[in-house]
């Protein structure tokens, strides 16, 4: 497994960023979607990607989760190069996907079980957990996102906000090291948004890491997130443009 050194930690020891992209390029159907993007996310950070539609935010999320592979450049997770060879190792790929929890902007893209309870239990059930630990994780995640009363409901019959909360519960039940969230509050009412915000603040306070995309600077301010702005030319800066507004989002 390839690895790369990172920044100095306590006592001068080398500590790799949890997420690092180095000059990553990705094209789709002859169109360059991500053009030489470099960024880092350290452990315990809450980082927001901002930028206009089409700048590549969603594609960057998919690259980080291993759903896409860069044409050129390097992606490192916890110091290890994530590429086709890495993901062909089924054991390594399974550990990687357990550590990187991804929630799509459209929750329908990741809901596939007959009931909410089965949906939330599916991920941790693949981890070989003892039955009592599996039950505890499912119960806690459903309570956390206030979907416990929907345990026997079909995910397909829920509102958009309920689906989003079920998708979050399903990923969080796996206790990933980092949550990668594509527009996590899109389509949520105020109460559901509060649930998500309070969870994210507590998650990071517990030492976990969050990388999210959003169009809403008010959400970034509320979370105290470090902002990375990607402009329409795919240039990356460490703060959103003062002229950048809060346009409603679409995937890019």
Model-derived segments and spans:
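Conserved ABC transporter NBD signature motif
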Residues: 73-85, 96
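The feature captures the beta-strand-to-loop junction immediately N-terminal to the Walker
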Residues: 50-52
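Helix-to-loop junction immediately C-terminal to a conserved catalytic motif
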Residues: 65
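Conserved ABC ATPase signature
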Residues: 154-158, 162
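Conserved ABC ATPase "signature" region
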Residues: 132-150
């Amino acid at each position: 497994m390839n690895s790369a050194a990172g920044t100095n930690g306590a006592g001068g020891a080398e500590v790799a960023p949890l997420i690092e992209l180095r000059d990553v390029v990705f094209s789709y159907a002859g169109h360059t979607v991500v053009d030489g993007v470099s960024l880092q996310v350290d452990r315990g950070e809450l980082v927001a990607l901002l930028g206009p539609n089409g700048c590549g935010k969603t594609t960057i999320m998919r690259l980080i989760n291993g759903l896409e592979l860069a044409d050129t450049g390097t992606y490192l997770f916890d110091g290890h190069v994530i590429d086709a060879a890495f993901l062909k190792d089924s054991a390594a790929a399974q550990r990687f996907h357990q550590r990187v929890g991804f929630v799509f902007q459209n929750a329908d893209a990741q809901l596939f079980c007959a009931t909410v309870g089965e949906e939330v239990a599916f991920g941790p059930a693949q981890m070989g957990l003892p039955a009592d630990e599996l039950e505890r994780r499912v119960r806690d995640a459903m309570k956390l996102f206030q979907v416990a009363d929907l345990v026997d409901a079909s995910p397909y019959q829920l509102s958009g906000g309920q689906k989003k909360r079920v998708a979050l519960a399903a990923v969080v039940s796996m206790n990933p090291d980092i949550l990668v969230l594509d527009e996590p509050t899109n389509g949520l009412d105020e109460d559901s948004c509060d649930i998500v915000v309070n969870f994210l603040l507590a998650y990071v306070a517990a030492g976990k890491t969050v990388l999210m995309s959003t169009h809403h600077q008010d959400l970034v301010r509320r979370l105290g997130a470090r902002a990375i702005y990607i402009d329409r030319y795919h240039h990356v800066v460490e703060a959103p443009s003062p002229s950048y507004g809060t346009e409603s989002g679409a995937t890019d």
